[in-house]
């Protein structure tokens, strides 16, 4: 029996003796920090393809505008701003040179007849986004079918969580709790033509939906919360305004250090001193962190 094993080992040794292993040399090219182009520089001189219409006289709009300025900068979308409170509705330019319009205002009354012009532009192939839950006014009721709205109430409901669709964004299909929720979302019932991309986890209130309107498209964000952590949801909603959106994928990892940084207690801990032979400060720096 031993002779058989020895013979097999000898055969394997002879068979593998001619096999040479070598490791390939891989080098990852890194872009020098001073060669990286800031987003603001990359957008400089670019022709705006997005028109953002705001009315900073309305409550909360100025803060929302600040968030969307950052979102559009991060997405490198060149845009032009028109503030109804400063410029007036007549400052809204011809929409023929734009492929998307974002309305940053709950009340549509200030648009006047320009709202009809915008909706005609959408029907001809433009894309329109309502970034804030719209007030239920006569203006909204006129255009509601084009937004995919069957009926809208005058009350607002609590958005305690958000459940994005799996085809809406990475991480879709899961429920995400919203901190400090309040009655922020307009109570609406949608038409069958509307495509709901995100909803609340409890009552299923539509939070983000789109609707085909003629040759164009409308997108409504009914979230009503604009904390920094919500930027990803609004960026995903902006991506619905086009047929395709490019975004970077970073091959990286994040490590979270518990309680870092924090004040370090002085002195020695009984068990830390016994088990590690270190002071509390040294244990924090050399072991825990």
Predicted regions: what is each one?
Residues 2-16:
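Hydrophobic membrane-insertion alpha-helices, especially the h-region
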Residues 17-40:
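Ser/Thr/Pro/Gly-rich low-complexity linker/stalk segments immediately outside membranes or between
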Residues 42-60, 254-256, 263:
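Short hydrophobic beta-strand segments
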Residues 51-52, 81, 100-104, 128-132, ...:
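Structural recognition of the beta-strand scaffold that forms the well-ordered cores
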Residues 58-138:
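Helical hinge/lid and interdomain linker segments adjacent to catalytic or ligand-binding clefts
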Residues 108-177:
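A glycine-rich, often tryptophan-bearing local segment used as a flexible ligand/cofactor-contacting loop or short
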Residues 159-217, 222-227:
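Catalytic beta-strand/loop cores that center a nucleophilic Ser/Cys/Thr
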Residues 226-233, 240-289:
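Active-site beta->alpha N-cap acidic-glycine motif
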